[in-house]
UniProtKB/Swiss-Prot annotation:
One of its GO terms (cellular component) is nucleus. Required for correct translation termination and probably involved in regulation of hypoxic gene expression. Residues 18-39 have a biased composition (Basic and acidic residues). The keyword Ubl conjugation does not apply. This is Enhancer of translation termination 1. Residues 1-45 are annotated as: Disordered. GO terms for biological process: positive regulation of SREBP signaling pathway; regulation of translation; translational termination. It holds the Pfam family Nro1. It is found in: Nucleus.
Amino acid sequence: MTKRPLGLGKKNKQKRHKPDEGADGKKESTPLDQIHVEVEGGGDPEDSVVQLKALWRNYLQSEREDERVLNGIVHECDRLLRNREQEGIELGEDFHSIYALALSELAIFRTEEKGQAGRESVGEFFDAAAERVDMGLQHFPASDVLALAKAKIIFQRIPLQYVSQLSPNNSEGADVGLQQLLEEGKSSFRVVAQDPLAVSEPLEIFSDLLEIIANFGREDEIDEGLDSDAEDEPEEVELPESHPLYELRQHLPEHAEWLQQQLLALFKVLEKPNAEEEESEATKFYRKIANKLGQSYLDAAAEPSIVFTTLTYETEDPSAEDEQKAQEAQRVAQGLTERAIEFFKEAESADDPQTWVDTAEVFISLGNLQENESETQEMLYKQAEEKMVRANKATNGKYKHILDTLLDSKT
């Protein structure tokens, strides 16, 4: 498989549109009534809460680069809170969720601010977001929507407020137990079937966080590796037990397993698309989650695959114990890789040859886990070759180098 880019705070590294400045140099927010929103689903366009939901939905579907929209949402939430009794406004779980998540999103913009003031600003916004979601849960303690929002805020907060201040040799910057905080977020997470996007985003943030933890201290070396043909990955940077990320790293396998289980739960509530829905957003989302699941199983297979390969092909005079370990590792790796293939197939698109290549590469990985030159191995390599040939033809030779490598390995 191709090397995966790190999820090192991708959002806060993107270019952001800052609020316009007034004549006095102060940042100006955009009032809600100056932002045009379209109300869907037959909602009352004069209803302030309906307008707020529409604006939030529009923001989520945008590039999320305009801080003014978030400021408009937060200001409107403040107004609704102040005037709820006077105007007879009923504020439900969605209102509290939007309010909290908008504050959390604003914290992302503050990560661009330098120095102590910037760090404090990030913390203040996350404090406000956490307070708001907890207040919502006081009113709606059984709300899955608010529980999910709380999980997302925690998953965002750990890398942006705490991990960003750390280095391998600097343990200052995290005055809370990060492992305990992450477990709190996991406990709060819910799969809300009626809003798959709201479910998937916290999981993406969680996945990015696991990569940050695993690769902490070697980001530059990995970035250089992504831009080169180097095969060897940089060695893991060891952390002292006193480091705030030490415990998180020790629990990485169980965190990865939790992520996989939540992706599975999300995938189960998605409808399998039909041929007529090839280009629909729902179909693209279905394939995206299928791809993530396939990758999660492939990642899980990596360690037993290495054990099998090392003991089988790189160990001279292996002992009986080594052979037993190799067989067990082979069995585990094969099962995980077979599961990965199932999901990569689900992620295939008739219009995207890269998805065929992704599946082909997993067939090769599974072939490498078979007895050398066995019928099963040859069959898997053949299936990979067929997909590679098809993709290569569809792209006028884009994958020729991969196909040539596969064919050379079979001769």
